[in-house]
Every structure is written in structure tokens, then in C-alpha cells.
Curated annotation (Swiss-Prot):
Positions bound to ATP: 33-40, 639-646
Name of this protein: UvrABC system protein A
GO function terms (MF aspect): ATP binding; ATP hydrolysis activity; DNA binding; excinuclease ABC activity; zinc ion binding
Gene encoding the protein: uvrA
GO biological process, one term: SOS response
Species of provenance: Listeria monocytogenes serotype 4b (strain F2365)
Zinc fingers classed as C4-type: ranges: 252-279, 738-764
Coiled coil start-end: none
Alphabetical keyword list: ATP-binding, Cytoplasm, DNA damage, DNA excision, DNA repair, DNA-binding, Excision nuclease, Metal-binding, Nucleotide-binding, Repeat, SOS response, Zinc, Zinc-finger
Localization of this protein: Cytoplasm
HAMAP family in the cross-refs: UvrA
Main location: cytoplasm
Quaternary structure (record): Forms a heterotetramer with UvrB during the search for lesions.
Length: 956
């Protein structure tokens, strides 16, 4: 066996055509090719699956049932495999308790740091809470010079009302002769006047001492007596100086605020020992959002100002509201904004104890009379959300609720006692709010004692290393408190990459899926050097990637193709990037060598004269941003990672447009207003989420082509004779489907500690339909055979059916001619799902008032796919007059835009400002723009190439 190579023979997973390939070990290997060509099938479904399977096979049968075991890949032979670790984009944690800090384990080290060198500080008095032994107290007193006069006291009453006669009697019985009351010293036998209704402090004077040699024992005994009498507290009054307050407990001597023994679990918001009891460590509470309940205060109650109580099905709440308003004298025709504060308070929060007469008449004419207090809209929604057993009702009420910072912990997730522990005047919650860059600066500037430095040194080493790795993969703008579920696929992948670098494993096979996603060109170099450093310590890296810089940095490049789907699955070229660039059969090689490229448009559109204007956007890190987007253009929002692109487009603009145009309830990010919405009719967000969550959804059903296909089969003579309607040809309802597998075509068999096995249905043999339905044929094929066709085959087959052909043509136009009409939605990649959505939009008639938003549409796309995607996006603008707004880092997309909005200058707090706007040429001239810096050479290079191509074409 060759130890220098991973040898694969006869790989046939998905569309792979029985391929043989050798991959050098301990190298940075990049796999590329068109979307759907078989890269992931080779990298993840063959190499990783076999590496993982072999590891799991080595475990006991008992252990295997707890681990998700991979299916054995369809391959003849794989040799030279190391233990495999997959770092893809699909395994991001959606758990609200998972944060950047917990995923990278930085939070675990911070917990240890605070448990070992943290100082509890009383939140009420701002003094450090310490626990001291008697020896430490004696040593502290003896630091004062000789002849210093002191008196030792036991504070037995602290800030309590009463005459305290019983307490004074007990002191007398103990044999003490002096006490101090409210700062005045009295003989115990004196008549002491103490006012009953005022707060008082009483200390027993235990001893009076002058500091000199040989008083250690007496001092020790006196302090010990004070501690015994005052439950662990002692006061040493230094005559002519301040008083010293000592405590045996972790408690404030003034107010008694106490902190238990410091231990790491106390600083975990996932542990009951540290989590805030109000929000259970989530940092947020689900509260009713008034602005969602009443989005438009210019409406009156009769005009339906209160969305959740609009009379749709039940008249109960509208009738209750009318009765309450009548009782409390509230005019239901007055706009809500003109009601008095008291009237609005009754509507929103209820009438408390005031009752009103309510007569409810239901749809059947039955009436019910009662006197009840008015509950109020907000408490009503909250109660129905908390108490209902119906998922439907809970989902309905959830639309009007939002996560607000917890009032107890202010969003820090931890108990008050935990947040009282400080290191350099910062509690652990504040450090978690730092960005990676700020955290690095904080730890570099920490001031600790010699002993603390010694304890914290190994912790600092680990924390700094992990922060450094996050910075190196371009994530220095993230905060450690950022919820893992809010990260993009690329960010989550690079976090796991940083965690793996921190482990410093060697001899491992890492398989990565497009780590450059969401990364600005500026940060790409750092990512590449990180990958190279992982290789240099003795690991093999297989990276599925389309980024040109990453491909050129590879030791070995494998191009899979030549096409996608059925047209792919072969090794087209393999070798160094330079060798692949010279290969005439490789599309990737053509793009690397410059033979093929995406041209620069000859002119930029100005739009139709109308524009959308965002005013005062402040969501997340946006700094009161104003932005204009010309309508009927292809516009692009750019900027370094974390600069605020998603905040501006997705949080503010998309949610505001969806709320206005689509009646969506999602609350937009903070902004003043958006002008020009009246020029639009609909907003379409085309993201990379699946087109369906079950295998029953497929490209034919999503684009609507399947409806027309079922109509066609139902219109055949045989179907009419048998009385079959359109529903007969659906695999989702009884009638035409196979009932043995309920139209799935496969049956799942659970194998417990082995992977679940899916076998074709024995009755329909995977065809989904019963025999009678399959008897119906159109042009020689039944419905099951039609679903097995590729889109290209379907287009030819239905060429005489314009309704179907038009829909299938758009799927071919977006470069998905290779997918099958009935291919389950769950097997489509994110990029493929996004293009199916685009295709379904292309065949719709438009009036130029649609607004499309795409967030990084080039994810998973080869340069050739990007060229096709751009043609489709330009078509939406050119032919339909619609507006397309894209968030993108890919320079091929950016250079094709009509208008750019560049955010920055940095990520996180250093971003959130508009750096430059205008055409790509204008941005390229900007000295402040990082995007412009990288765009300029690409524009110049490709303009030159475009001019050369035009000149060559003219000569011919």
C-alpha cells in the first residue's frame, strides 16, 4: 500500500461514473467542478463516509447505536485513509444556548479564569467581598505602626429598626461593659435611648489595644470572639483612621450580599448554579410586542387596528372589546394615536379590578351574560401563548411576540451573584460581549498580582490561541456571546475550523466544504494561510471550493465534470493548478487560464428614475445609515465580513418590505423610515433554504409544472374512460398512489445500532403509484417514468405543451437541466434549491414592480454556473423591469452590477457605515473601500479581455 496517497477505485456514489483517483496525502487538495458535478459525492459521501465508517466499526456494537453510522459508500476500494473529520456548513447548532464562546470552548476557559482569580464585588456598595482567616485579619491589623490605638468590635445589629432592648440585655449577661450605638460609645449600664422607628447599628466593644510587640495572641482571641458574636463579622476601629471590616464569609459586611465559593459551574449559563433564574440562562424573555399587535396606530378599533383580534373566524374577542369600550367610554372610531394614555392602557393592559357587563352572542344565536374585568390585549396574547395545548394557537400567538433582553440579567444570562465577580473591573458577561479583537486587547492589558498571573498563565495561553485562530480565519468581528444559530454557514464552518486548529491534531484527514463562503477577498489570504498551516503540521486537507485564489494555492487540484448531474461524475483533470489550467478538456482550466471569463457589461443601467430610500437604519452595528437603491437595476451590497450587509438588507429592508407588501408579522430592525415602497407590489426573498422539507417535494411540484403534467395525463382518452381526475396522479393523496408505501416509493427499516435501511417498496417497486394509475400513458410513458426524466429530457418530451415547456425551459436556463423532475427536494444542494426558486420566478408574468433579494447566491457555484446565474438575474431586470438586490463578495457578480453600496470600513463595531456608493468603476476608484481595492484589477483585466474578444469577433 502506498503511504503517500489515498487510492480510490470504482467510486459510484450518486452520479460518480465508477471513477478511480489518487489523492496525495499531507497536501492541500482542492476539488472543484460545476454545481452538481459530483464533488460532494466523492469528498463527503465516499471518502469521509468510509473514513468515519471504519472508525465507528472499530467500536463495540453497544457504542455504535449511539453514533450516527454512515452508510457504506458504493466504492470498490479505498486505501490510505486516515481518521476523517468533516467540517461542512450543515451542522450549525440551532440550540439557543450555544454561542461562539461555548462552541470554541473559550467560555469554558473564561469560567475557569473567573473561578480562580475573580474578585466578588458587592453590587450595592461597590466593595470587594472577601473571605479571610483570623490569621489574615491579625496580619492586616499588625501592618499598622506601633503605638496605634485600636478597638475591636462585634457588629451584632446592622441597619435594623427597633429599640433592641433584648439584644442589650443579652450583651450585659455575656459580661461586656461597652457598646457603640450609631457611632456613640455607651457604658452597658447607662440609660440608652433608642428610637423604635429608626434604623440602628450596634457593636459590642470586645477589646481596646495599643499595637506593640507580643500582642498577637490577645489580638487573635479578641477578633475570634468578635467573629463568634457577630456571625463571622468583626470591625477593627483604627483610632484617628478608617475602620476595617472583616468577614469569614463571601458576603458584603454592610448588606449581607453573599457569594458562594467560586467554582467554574457558577459561571455557566447552562448550569442551574449559574443561570439567571428569570430567563433560565437564555438572556431573553418572550414578550408580546406592541408594535406587531398594533402596526398602524392611525387606524381606529373599528378599522381593525388590533391585528390579533380582527373578526376573522370567532366574534368573541371583537364583541368583548366593543362591550369593554362601551363601559369605559372609549370611542372605537377614534384613531389609536389620538386616544388618551389611560384609554390606551385599558385596551392594552386591561381594566385591573374594574368590571364591565359582557353579553356574548355566538354564531348559533346563543347568548351568555356576565360581569368580568377586561383582561387587556397584551396579557390575553401572553396567556393564550403560555396556556394553550394547541400548536396552531401557539404559532398564531408567537407571531405577536418577540425576544426582549431579560429584565433581571440584562441579557447576560447569568445570576446576579455570578455577575458580581470581576476581573479588572469586568464581569464575565461583559467580556463575552467583546468582539474577538477587543477580547485580545483586553487580555493583553490585564493587570493581575504575581500569584494571580501564575495561576492564570495556562488559561491565558489557551484563550489567546483560540482568539488568534478566530482572527486568522476572518472572524475578528464576532462577539463571544453571539448565538451560534445566527451565524451564516461560512461563519459556522470557519469557527469549527478554528476549533480544529486549536486541537493541533496531526495525521488527520480534514474535508471542508467551501470555507471561503461569506468571506471578503481581504480576509481570504488569511484563510488560505490557515489551511496551509494545518497541512504543514502533518494533515491532509480535501477542500471542495470554487474560489480562484484557493484553487491556485492548492498543492493538487481535481476537476470533476465535465457537466453536472448525469453529465458529470468523471475526473476531467487532476494535477497542480498550472497543469489543470493547461488542460483543454477542463472548464475550470479555461477559467483559470483566462480563456473563459465573465465579461464586464458594456453599460450600466440608471434605473427607471424611482428609488427605494432607507433612512436612519440602526439594526445591530449599523450607524444610522441612509441608503438609496435605484429601482429597475441590478444592485449589489458589498463589504467585509461583519460590516452590516445582512443587517441592512435582511433585518431592515427585507422585513420592512415584507411587513408592508406581504403582511408579514416579523419585526424589522431599527430604522426611521423607508421611502418609495409604494412603487413596489411584492418582495421575493430567494435564499438557499430547501424548496421542501420532505422527499415528496420536487422541482416539478415547486415550479408548478407537475400540476400541468397531471392535467395532461387526466386529459388522455384512457383516463377519461376510467373517470380519472387530476388528483389520481398525485402521490400525496389516496386514490392513485401506492398505499403500501403511501406514495414514498421506499420503506424505512430501523436497524437500531446499524444505520436505518431504506428499501424499495415491494408492491410498486419504487414507482409510488398503483398499477391502475401506471396504465395511463402519454406518448408511451406513464407518470412514474415522466418523474424519472431529467429536465432536459422532459423539455424535449413536452415540446408540444407550451405551459409545461415554458416552466421546464426556465429550469434549463438556470443551469439545472440535469436534475430529475421528481428528484426529492431533500437531495438538492443549497445552490440548486436557490436556482429552482429563481426558475419558478422566471416563468411568471411581471409588471416591473417586483423586488428580489438574494443573499450570497454564488454559494456552491462554479464560475460557469455564476455566468448562467448572472444572465438570469440580468434577465429579470432587462426583460421584466424588476429590481434585484444581492449581498455578495464574489467579484464576478460585483463587476456586473449596475449599482453598488459598499459598507465598512471593518467588521463588527468597526463597521456599519456606508463607505461608497455608485457604479463598480466608481467604487474601484475609492481609496477607502477594501472592495474597490480588489475590484479595480479585476475590472481592468476583464475589460481588456472583453475588448480583445470583441476585436477578435470583428476580424472573423
Amino acid at each position: 500500500m502506498d503511504k503517500e496517497k489515498i487510492v480510490i477505485q470504482g467510486a459510484r456514489a450518486h452520479n460518480l461514473k465508477n471513477i478511480d483517483v489518487e489523492i496525495p496525502r499531507d497536501k492541500l487538495v482542492v476539488m472543484t467542478g460545476l454545481s452538481g458535478s459530483g464533488k460532494s459525492s466523492l469528498a463527503f459521501d465516499t471518502i469521509y463516509a468510509e473514513g468515519q465508517r471504519r472508525y465507528v466499526e472499530s467500536l463495540s456494537a453497544y457504542a455504535r447505536q449511539f453514533l450516527g453510522q454512515m452508510d457504506k459508500p458504493d466504492v470498490d476500494l479505498i486505501e490510505g485513509l486516515s481518521p476523517a473529520i468533516s467540517i461542512d456548513q450543515k451542522t450549525t447548532s440551532r440550540n439557543p444556548r450555544s454561542t461562539v464562546g461555548t462552541v470554541t470552548e473559550i467560555h469554558d476557559y473564561l469560567r475557569l479564569l473567573y473561578a480562580r482569580v475573580g474578585h466578588p464585588v458587592c453590587p450595592n456598595h461597590g466593595i470587594e467581598i472577601t473571605s479571610q482567616t483570623i490569621e489574615q485579619m491579625v496580619d492586616r491589623v499588625l501592618e499598622y505602626p506601633e503605638k496605634t490605638r485600636i478597638q475591636i468590635m462585634a457588629p451584632i445589629v446592622s441597619g435594623k429598626k427597633g429599640t433592641h432592648k433584648k439584644t442589650i440585655e443579652e450583651i450585659k449577661k455575656e459580661g461586656y461593659v461597652r457598646i457603640r450605638v450609631d457611632g456613640e460609645i455607651y457604658d452597658i449600664n447607662d440609660e440608652i435611648e433608642i428610637e423604635k422607628n429608626k434604623k440602628h447599628s450596634i457593636e459590642i466593644i470586645i477589646d481596646r489595644i495599643v499595637i506593640k510587640e507580643g500582642i498577637n495572641t490577645r489580638l487573635y482571641d479578641s477578633i475570634e470572639a468578635a467573629l463568634r458574636l457577630a456571625d463571622g463579622y468583626a470591625v477593627v476601629d483604627i483610632m484617628g483612621d478608617k475602620e476595617l471590616l472583616f468577614s469569614e464569609h463571601y458576603a458584603c459586611p454592610y448588606c449581607g450580599f453573599s457569594v458562594g465559593e467560586l467554582e467554574p459551574r457558577m459561571f455557566s449559563f447552562n448550569s442551574p448554579f449559574g443561570a439567571c433564574p428569570t430567563c433560565d440562562g437564555l438572556g431573553t424573555k418572550l414578550e408580546v410586542d406592541v408594535d406587531t399587535v398594533i402596526p398602524d396606530r392611525s387606524l381606529s378599533l373599528n378599522e381593525g387596528a388590533i391585528i390579533p383580534w380582527r373578526p376573522i373566524s370567532s366574534q368573541y374577542y371583537p364583541q368583548m372589546l366593543a362591550s369593554a369600550c362601551k363601559e369605559f367610554g372609549i370611542d372605537m372610531d377614534t384613531p389609536l394615536e389620538k386616544l388618551t394614555k389611560e384609554e390606551l392602557d385599558i385596551i392594552l393592559n386591561g381594566s385591573k379590578d374594574k368590571e364591565f357587563y359582557f353579553e356574548y352572542k355566538n354564531d348559533f344565536g346563543m347568548t351568555r351574560e356576565t360581569w368580568i374585568p377586561f383582561e387587556g390585549i397584551l396579557p390575553n396574547i401572553e396567556r393564550r401563548y403560555r396556556e394553550t395545548n394547541s400548536d396552531f394557537t401557539r404559532d398564531q400567538m408567537a407571531q405577536y411576540m418577540t425576544d426582549l433582553p431579560c429584565p433581571s440579567c440584562k441579557g447576560y444570562r447569568l445570576k446576579e451573584e455570578t455577575l458580581s465577580v470581576k476581573v479588572n473591573n469586568h464581569h464575565i458577561g461583559q467580556i463575552s460581549e467583546f468582539s474577538i479583537n477587543e477580547a485580545l486587547d483586553f487580555f493583553d492589558g490585564l493587570e493581575l498580582s504575581e500569584k494571580e498571573t501564575q495561576i492564570a498563565a495556562p488559561i491565558f495561553k489557551e484563550v489567546r490561541a483560540r482568539l488568534g485562530f478566530l482572527k486568522n480565519v476572518g472572524l475578528d468581528y464576532l462577539t463571544m456571546s453571539r448565538a451560534a444559530g445566527t451565524l451564516s454557514g461560512g461563519e459556522a464552518q470557519r469557527i469549527r475550523l478554528a476549533t480544529q486548529i486549536g486541537s493541533r491534531l496531526t495525521g488527520v484527514l480534514y474535508i471542508l466544504d467551501e470555507p471561503s463562503i461569506g468571506l471578503h477577498q481581504r480576509d481570504n489570504d488569511r484563510l488560505i494561510s490557515t489551511l496551509q498551516s494545518m497541512r504543514d503540521i502533518g494533515n491532509t486537507l480535501i477542500v471542495v471550493e470554487h474560489d480562484e485564489d484557493t484553487m491556485m494555492a492548492a498543492d493538487y487540484l481535481i476537476d470533476i465534470g465535465p457537466g453536472a448531474g448525469e453529465h458529470g461524475g468523471r475526473i476531467v483533470a487532476a494535477g497542480t493548478p498550472e497543469e489543470v489550467a493547461k488542460n483543454k478538456n477542463s472548464i475550470t482550466g479555461d477559467y483559470l487560464s483566462g480563456k473563459k471569463f465573465i465579461p464586464v457589461p458594456a453599460k450600466r443601467r440608471k434605473g427607471n428614475g424611482l428609488e427605494l430610500e432607507i433612512i436612519g437604519a440602526k439594526a445591530n452595528n449599523l450607524k444610522n445609515v441612509n441608503a438609496k437603491i435605484p429601482l429597475a437595476t441590478f444592485s449589489c451590497v458589498t463589504g467585509v465580513s461583519g460590516s452590516g450587509k445582512s443587517s441592512l438588507v435582511n433585518e431592515v429592508l427585507r422585513k420592512a418590505l415584507a411587513r408592508k407588501l406581504n403582511r408579514n408579522h416579523a419585526k424589522p430592525g431599527e430604522h426611521k423610515e423607508i421611502k418609495g415602497i409604494e412603487n413596489l407590489e411584492k418582495i421575493i426573498n430567494i435564499d438557499q433554504s430547501p424548496i421542501g422539507r420532505t422527499p415528496r417535494s420536487n422541482p416539478a411540484t415547486y415550479t408548478g409544472a407537475f400540476d400541468d403534467i397531471r392535467d395532461l395525463f387526466a386529459s388522455t382518452n384512457e383516463a377519461k374512460v376510467r373517470g380519472y381526475k387530476k388528483g389520481r396522479f398525485s402521490f400525496n393523496v389516496k386514490g392513485g398512489r401506492c398505499e403500501a408505501c403511501k406514495g414514498d416509493g421506499i420503506i424505512k427499516i430501523e436497524m437500531h445500532f446499524l444505520p436505518d435501511v431504506y428499501v424499495p417498496c415491494e408492491v410498486c417497486h419504487g414507482k409510488r403509484y398503483n398499477g391502475e394509475t401506471l396504465d395511463i400513458r402519454y406518448k408511451g410513458k406513464n407518470i412514474a417514468e415522466v418523474l424519472e426524466m431529467t429536465v432536459e429530457e422532459g423539455l424535449e418530451y413536452f415540446t408540444n405543451q407550451p405551459r409545461i415547456a415554458r416552466k421546464l425551459q426556465t429550469i434549463v436556463d438556470v443551469g439545472l437541466g440535469y436534475i430529475r423532475l421528481g428528484q426529492p427536494a431533500t437531495t438538492l444542494s443549497g445552490g440548486e434549491a436557490q436556482r429552482v426558486k429563481l426558475a419558478s420566478e422566471l416563468h411568471k408574468r411581471s409588471n416591473g414592480k417586483s423586488f428580489y433579494i438574494l443573499d450570497e447566491p454564488t454559494t456552491g457555484l462554479h464560475a460557469d454556473d455564476i455566468g448562467r446565474l448572472l444572465k438570469v438575474l440580468q434577465r429579470l431586470v432587462e426583460e421584466n423591469g424588476d429590481t434585484v438586490l444581492v449581498i455578495e463578495h464574489n467579484l464576478d457578480v460585483i463587476k456586473q452590477a449596475d449599482y453598488l453600496i459598499d459598507l465598512g470600513p471593518e467588521g463588527g463595531d468597526g463597521g456599519g457605515q456606508i463607505i461608497a456608493t455608485g457604479t463598480p468603476e466608481k467604487i474601484a476608484r475609492s481609496k477607502k473601500s477594501y472592495t474597490g481595492k480588489y475590484l479595480k484589477p479585476i475590472l481592468e483585466r476583464d475589460k481588456e479581455r472583453t475588448e480583445e474578444r470583441i476585436a477578435t469577433a470583428k476580424k472573423k
